[in-house]
Amino acid sequence: MEIKQPDVTVTENLISPEPDDAFIAIPVFIGYTSSLVNKTAIKLNSLADFTRSFTLSFPESGLMYYSVRHFFENGGQQAYVLSLGSDETLNDFPSFITALRQVWITQAISAENDITLIVTPDAIRFNRPDTSYIQRNLWLKFWQSVLNLCKSRRGIMALLDAPDDPELAAKCLAQFSSNDRQWGAVYWPQLNSAYRDQAQNPIVLSPTAAVAAVIQRNDNQRGVWTAPANIALAKVISPVHSYIEANALFNPDGASLNLVRSFPGKGIRIWGCRTLENTPGSLWRYIQIRRLVSYIEAHMTQLGRAFIFEPNNAITWMKFKGQAYNWLRQLWLNGGLRGTQEDQAFELLLGVGESMSEADIRAGKMIMKIKLAVLIPAEFIELSLTFDTRTTR
């Protein structure tokens, strides 16, 4: 709106800080490279970016190189790499786990707001025919160490590898106890890739790099709320193990991993979309549900930050609620929320007596409550977002 006065022109524009709806699941590859880049996550938009940053000699032959290559050749568009050191410094599984626990790694991840997935392809280096308690304990420590990295910021998930031995993998699933299960998904088995070593043998890769690309592509093409499953992988000759060996690993009721299996005439496909969560009836057992809710939470938080500079009153609440409503309604129309009617899909609460008390307002809190039907119409989960308006004054 333009207001004209003698010698003065005032133009008022409505600034609507809408979040970027082109949500992309952006992974960070954490592991060992030919060269070390000190304590910084390097952003990649192509395989060429990787070779410029990490390659000392040609042709490149490191496991991280082939994992990143597999990511881009499966349709990945953007990723980060966080180098723990040169390949020569990786000694054994315990040292890898110790490296993942360094404080600077958490700091490097939290510094990049668009990272939402963690991939650690070097874990497959430590597969042993040993099914002892010691080996099992190392894998459980590895899983928890990566899940701890997911706490660097809300909304980050880990794509995890499992032991190559089916018996050991089943024991790990049965004995893994953690409060962070919903933030991890395990994929099995390893893959014989189409890439060749100097002896012309297939290079064995973790499935997680290709899975990260599939999730990223699925978000763009179908939406974050759709299951990243039954999707073919490129540059794969075969899984290292047949799905027939995995009877104890794919569990419809308890903790489960996700298989990569071969279908005659249909290629090598991801078969499953489960997190490690094993609570019966929990919505967090499904990757797409966990990521959808994180997606909504992130967008609503970003939207709400624009209003913490405003007075904590009914006018501000109306503006915030209006923009949040429009975004959620569009998400529902796109198929992201369940229900044939709007009130079956979501509900927004913001105001005194709805989401806040007078005491909350005096304390400088602006609280929005969001009810979401993410699986069944009119069966809601509730998010509560609290913004501290006092810190801005």
Question: Could you describe each region identified by the protein language model?
Answer:
Residues 128:
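Glycine/Thr-rich phosphate-binding loops of Rossmann-like dinucleotide-binding domains
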Residues 64, 96-103, 131-146:
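Well-ordered, non-membrane alpha-helical segments in soluble/globular domains
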Residues 85-99:
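Aromatic/His-enriched, Gly/Pro-containing loop or helix-boundary segments
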Residues 103-109:
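Short, T/G/N/S-enriched strand-turn elements that build extracellular solenoid repeat scaffolds
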Residues 1-88, 110-124, 148-393:
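Structured, hydrophobic secondary-structure cores that serve as assembly/anchoring elements
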